[in-house]
Amino acid sequence: METVRIATRKSPLALWQSEHVADRLRQAHPGLHVELVPMSTRGDEVLDRSLAAIGGKGLFLKELELAMLRGEADCAVHSLKDVPMELDPPFALPAMLTRHDPADGFVSNLYASLDALPIGARVGTSSLRRQAQLRALRPDLELLDLRGNVNTRLAKLDNGGYDAIVLAVAGLERLGLGERIVARLQPPQWLPAPAQGAVAVECDGGNARLMALFAPLDDAATRACVEAERAMNRALHGSCHVPVAAIAQWQGDDLHLQGLVGSASDGRAVRAEAVGPANDPEGLGQRVAKLLLDDGAGELLNV
């Protein structure tokens, strides 16, 4: 019996996503044996500093990629928003699964919305993108760092450390915690991270057998959207060190891409949007990036 080993982080959300991919693989290939290889990454272990301070979201990938290179796993499953814009050889993304809700969720035990927060309320997030948009919308708030997995963050809220926190809707709903969302933060006022809500499979792009195994899991509509968002981010040289947000949505047969570059320190933000053919998401992403740069985003990117 053929076996596929999936490298995954150990967090509940990462395990859920990897098991979801495993289930889809078993459905697509009856008789295939799929097993998870849970691993801890530096991004999971260092929780007292922001991701930007310790090397960025790529920390979530490196150990999993090393496991593949050592032959301990055949593939890895990631939240696509954590995947760098450029993969190191020989890696590729053979499958981007159907995207979940890409929105951010406002979570609070006391207040029904972002607007309802009192002046000086404490909001937890370590995401520079979320901080930038919070400062733009509510410059009076006190923004506090918040790291850890979803359950850890919720526990910190419940223990009184924050008046509200912001988490991805997809992560909460995948873990059966959707009832904790009191409001969705959505376009056009609020934009998610590029590729937020999408799960991707990574493997050796030169391994034709693996590439073919994962091909049935790929969702073309999702891939078009997230490739436009990631192309914009790539053209801006964005990373978790810079507040960049993007969302592409289908508009008939075309894609509508909205992008934002912000400042986590003072709430300044530059926005741009464009519509383009779905068969050229790269071009659309580059066009919106140019619009952002033409409108002054470069100044924020170089802060």
Swiss-Prot record:
Cofactor: binding details: Binds 1 dipyrromethane group covalently.
CDD domains, per database record: PBP2_EcHMBS_like
EC number of the protein: 2.5.1.61
Alphabetical list of Pfam families matching this protein: Porphobil_deam, Porphobil_deamC
GO biological process: protoporphyrinogen IX biosynthetic process
Catalytic activity: 4 porphobilinogen + H2O = hydroxymethylbilane + 4 NH4(+)
S-(dipyrrolylmethanemethyl)cysteine: modified positions: 240
Keywords: Porphyrin biosynthesis, Transferase
Enzyme category, top tier: transferase
GO cellular component: cytoplasm
Function: Tetrapolymerization of the monopyrrole PBG into the hydroxymethylbilane pre-uroporphyrinogen in several discrete steps.
Protein family (similarity comment): Belongs to the HMBS family.
Other observations noted: The porphobilinogen subunits are added to the dipyrromethane group.
Assembly: Monomer.
Protein name (Swiss-Prot/TrEMBL): Porphobilinogen deaminase
Species this protein is from: Stenotrophomonas maltophilia (strain K279a)
Recorded name of the encoding gene: hemC
